[in-house]
Amino acid sequence: MRIAGRPIELIVDVDPEIPEVLMGDPLRLSQIFTNLINNATKFTESGSITLKIKQEQVLGNNVKLSFSVIDTGIGMTSEQLQHLFNAFTQADGSITRKYGGTGLGLVISKSLVELMGGELRVESEYGKGSKFFFTITLALASQVAVPKWKSVSTFKNKNVLLVDDCER
C-alpha cells in the first residue's frame, strides 16, 4: 500500500470485544485520529502506521478503551519530546522547513483528549518511530436508542426540526 506516495503499510487493529454501539463524540475522536495519523504519515518515509483500539475494562455502563497510533518514522529525541505539546512548536526548526505544518495538531489533539477525560501521551525513539496513545471511557449505548434506517427514502417528504443548546 502507498500512503502519501510512499511505501507505508496501514494496519488497523480493533479489539473484537468492543461493543458495537458506544456513546461518545465521534467528531472529536475523528479529529484526534486525523491529526495523529497525518503526523505519522508526515514523518514516516516507509514502514508502517498502526492504529490500535483495545477494550481495557467494562465499568458498569461504561467501557474504558485505549487508542494508539504507532509509526516507524523518524522518531524524536528526549529533548524534542519536552516541547512536543507546546503550541506553534515542532520538534526543531528544520522540521517545519522540511515537513511543514503549524505545530497545532498535537496541541489540539491533547486538548480534545483531555476534554474527554483522558491524557495524550507519547513514547518515541529517535530513528525508530513514535507511539501516541490515550485511554478514555465511553458509555454503553442502548441498541434501542440507535435506530437503523433501511433507506434514505424513510425521510422523503418529512420535515425535521433541529434544536441545539450550544451557545455561540
What spans do the regions from the language model cover?
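Short helix-loop "hinge" at the ATP-lid/N-box region of the Bergerat-fold HATPase_c
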Residues: A40-T41
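Glycine-rich ATP-binding loops of the HATPase_c
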Residues: G117-E123
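Glycine-rich G1-box
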Residues: M1, I74-G75
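Disordered, acidic interdomain junction associated with two-component signaling
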Residues: I11-D13, E56-V63, E79, F133-D164
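Short alpha-helical Gxxx[C/S/T] motif in the catalytic ATP-binding
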Residues: G100, G105, S109
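Conserved catalytic submotifs in the C-terminal HATPase_c
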Residues: A4, E9-E20, E56
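Short conserved segment of the HATPase_c
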Residues: M76-Q90
